């Protein structure tokens, strides 16, 4: 029986993340030197597994806090950790002695899971430039470090550009809004629209003011660019350009033609051509239906439509055909009912129980959910559901740790949905419910794992073109009458 103890709870108030990362990386470097001399599973992979578990915990909580509780002070320290981490993994991937140790392990007696892990690890060394020498090896390491910094800069620019734009409007500008929509943008005695997702979707869907829809749409799609109205200091154009050039250079160093060839090396799909064929087939299958639906919308509107018109007239057409407004659904889906239905669905599917527990966390809105079966705790989920200004947009699941020895899996589930207003509960629309089920599908994938090796437990080591299967499976239950 497993027990969730303090070591399985993330430290959401780290004192010195640079020192902490430096410490675990230095220890990892010492342990990997020992592993490079090993010749069996325990002396090689077992040692590295322990390293990965400890380093992964430090990295994941830092990355999570930077995404959901962004501040300039924390980000400054977070950026200092990126080269340390990048250099550690670059050195690990280029370690020829460790590479040879894995090849020795490959020739020992292994079970199916172990064979899979060793095979993927050997490929990982090769994609990390283990065969490169001299200046090529040095340049590869420089590229990896720079890419880690640029990736963080890109996300930071998008977040800050999103937060930089606000517009005060009159209530007349918001004709078409109901009280629920108005409450989201009411600030004191005025109304302020922003680029936060819940506000943006409401405005695109319900605002009669076409000029305002266009203004907000253009501000949203041009965030962090040189053509938008957000500050030029957040422009990601040069960041993207450098990322593309470095990815190309990195791929060529490995003997590949382009980054697409590099990317598919760790995917289920076997070639860039297969990806293009799939996308072209998807266009072929969907184009006729999309064209028909657009014509129906334009006939209904009485004029050609621009992107900022599509959600608005789709909602209007729905109301005309079905005498139904999407917002009318929301009172039937308060947050408590949605989570109760989600928990019941998961319990019926997997014979597990989900219980909300009390725990100090990085923000009072975060729900902490324990997953248990008849033998005790299985794992834990930190559910951060509401949109905030210092929080990265979108929805995702990430892991704090996987199933390993006495450690149970812990996951972060993040959304950017409506928050309670004026003492009233948060109300969700159907698409938001689908999002919640989707992200919990990822969390279940991680928590219900039976694999106890960190590099393959839960979502770890799963190709990105396969990892969406459990989450999309969970989405389907939103359409089941018994669940709704």
Question: PLM features: what roles do these ranges have?
Answer:
Residues 449-475, 479:
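The catalytic-center signature of Zn2+-dependent metalloproteases
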Residues 256-257, 441-455:
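Catalytic Zn2+-binding segment of zinc metalloproteases
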Residues 431-446, 471:
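Active-site recognition of the HExxH zinc-binding catalytic motif
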Residues 5-16, 62-81, 104-142, 192-237, ...:
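Short His/Asp/Glu-rich catalytic/ion-coordination signatures at enzyme active sites or charged loops
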Residues 17, 133, 255, 346, ...:
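Divalent metal-coordination and catalytic microenvironments
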Residues 334, 417-437:
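Short pre-active-site segment immediately N-terminal to the catalytic Zn-binding motif
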Residues 113, 117, 146-149, 156, ...:
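Active-site-proximal, well-structured secondary-structure segments within enzyme catalytic domains
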Residues 2-176:
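N-terminal helix-rich structural modules
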């Amino acid at each position: 029986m497993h027990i969730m103890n303090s070591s399985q709870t993330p430290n959401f108030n780290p004192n010195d993340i640079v020192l902490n990362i430096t410490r675990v990386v230095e220890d990892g470097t010492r342990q990997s030197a020992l592993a490079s001399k090993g010749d069996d599973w325990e002396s090689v992979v077992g040692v590295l597994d322990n390293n990965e578990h400890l380093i992964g915990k430090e990295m994941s909580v830092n990355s999570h806090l930077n995404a959901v509780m962004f501040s300039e002070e924390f980000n400054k320290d977070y950026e200092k950790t990126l080269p340390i981490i990048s250099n550690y993994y670059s050195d690990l991937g280029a370690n020829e002695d460790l590479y040879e140790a894995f090849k020795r392990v490959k020739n020992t007696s292994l079970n199916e899971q172990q064979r899979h892990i060793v095979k993927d690890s050997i490929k990982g060394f090769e994609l990390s430039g283990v065969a490169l020498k001299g200046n090529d090896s040095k340049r590869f390491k420089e590229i990896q470090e720079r890419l880690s910094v640029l990736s963080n800069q890109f996300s930071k620019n998008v977040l800050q550009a999103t937060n930089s734009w606000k517009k005060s409007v009159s209530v007349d500008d918001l004709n078409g809004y109901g009280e629920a929509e108005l409450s989201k943008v009411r600030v004191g005695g005025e109304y302020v629209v922003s680029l936060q997702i819940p506000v943006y979707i409401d405005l695109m869907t319900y605002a009669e003011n076409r000029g305002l829809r266009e203004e907000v749409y253009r501000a949203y799609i041009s965030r962090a660019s040189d053509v938008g109205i957000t500050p030029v200091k957040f422009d990601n154009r040069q960041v993207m350009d450098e990322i593309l050039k470095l990815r190309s250079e990195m791929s060529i160093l490995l003997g590949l033609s382009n980054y697409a060839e590099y990317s598919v090396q760790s995917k289920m799909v076997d070639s860039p051509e297969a990806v293009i064929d799939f996308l072209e087939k998807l266009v072929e299958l969907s184009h006729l239906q999309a064209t028909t639906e657009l014509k129906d919308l334009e006939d209904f509107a009485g004029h050609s439509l621009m992107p900022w018109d599509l959600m608005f007239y789709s909602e209007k057409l729905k109301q005309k055909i079905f005498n139904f407004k999407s917002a009318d659904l929301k009172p039937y889906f308060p947050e408590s009912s949605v989570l109760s239905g989600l928990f019941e669905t998961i319990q019926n599917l997997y014979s597990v129980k989900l219980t909300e527990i009390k725990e100090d966390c990085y923000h009072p809105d975060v729900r902490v959910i324990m997953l248990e079966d008849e033998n005790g705790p299985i794992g834990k989920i930190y559910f951060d559901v509401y949109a905030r200004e210092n929080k990265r947009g979108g929805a995702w699941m990430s892991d704090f740790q996987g199933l390993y020895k006495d450690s149970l899996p812990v996951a972060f589930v993040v959304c950017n949905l409506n928050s309670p207003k004026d003492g009233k509960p948060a109300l969700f629309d159907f698409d938001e419910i689908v999002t919640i089920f989707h992200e919990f599908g990822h969390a279940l994938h991680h928590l219900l794992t039976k694999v106890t090796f960190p590099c393959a437990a839960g979502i770890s080591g799963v190709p990105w073109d396969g990892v969406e299967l459990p989450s999309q499976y969970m989405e389907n239950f939103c359409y089941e009458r018994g669940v709704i």
